Design a protein with these regions (language model features):
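Small-residue-rich midsections of specific transmembrane alpha-helices
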Residues: 1-15, 30, 68-76, 151, ...
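Interhelical loop/hinge segments that connect adjacent transmembrane helices in multipass membrane
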Residues: 115-144, 151-178
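Short membrane-interface helical motifs at transmembrane helix boundaries
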Residues: 36-58, 114-129
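Membrane-interface junctions at transmembrane-helix termini in multi-pass inner-membrane proteins
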Residues: 12-18, 70-94, 160
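Residue-level recognition of pore/gate-forming positions within transmembrane alpha-helices
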Residues: 34, 68, 98-102, 145-153
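Interfacial transmembrane-helix starts/ends
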Residues: 15-32, 176
Length: 178
């Protein structure tokens, strides 16, 4: 939803001569849409979460919105890696994200839970009590996913570093229509 088909448009319009122009244009559009959707979910988190029947869990919705926004935003740099035929880097970054997500889920949902409960490594309880609250529950799944997705930024930094926010309605129209 956050990429609204722009990944496909990037492949269609980004040739070797003008890939930078379309990269900036399309990534700018995806960042703007992701920002707007995320802002909507942040501003209306309370009524939306109440409507869903999970009052008091606004943080879940905010983290979910941020995860989806980051997924949308990094889709274009990933498309650029594919266009530039860099499969090893693409695979490395994707696998690093998956591995970090799994490790963080194990850390929060098993390791911290068990230390908090006093099952082992009780000397770590003071530290774990600061970072782990059992009542947060499934929120740790969202948190792990958010942290893992934030790791995309340093892993893809060179693709963000040369990005320049750009919007040209005339150039964007055919991209949007595609």
């Amino acid at each position: 939803l956050y990429t609204f088909g722009m990944e496909t448009s990037f492949f269609r319009f980004a040739s070797r001569d003008n890939s930078k122009q379309y990269y900036n244009l399309i990534l700018s559009a995806v960042i703007a849409v992701s920002g707007a959707f995320t802002l909507f979910f942040v501003l209306f988190a309370t009524p939306l979460i109440n409507l869903l029947g999970y009052p008091g869990r606004e943080s879940y919705l905010v983290m979910l919105a941020l995860v989806v926004a980051l997924d949308g935003i990094v889709a274009i740099p990933f498309a650029r890696l594919r266009l530039e035929r860099k499969p090893r880097r693409f695979a490395f970054v994707r696998m690093a994200n998956i591995l970090l997500n799994v490790l963080l889920n194990v850390f929060f949902l098993l390791f911290c839970r068990d230390i908090h409960a006093g099952k082992y490594l009780t000397f770590l309880q003071p530290v774990v009590h600061v970072i782990y609250k059992p009542e947060f529950g499934v929120g740790y799944v969202f948190l792990a996913n958010l942290i893992a997705n934030l790791a995309f930024i340093p892993l893809l930094w060179d693709l963000f570093r040369d990005f320049r926010f750009r919007f040209d309605a005339a150039a964007f129209r055919p991209v949007w229509l595609y």
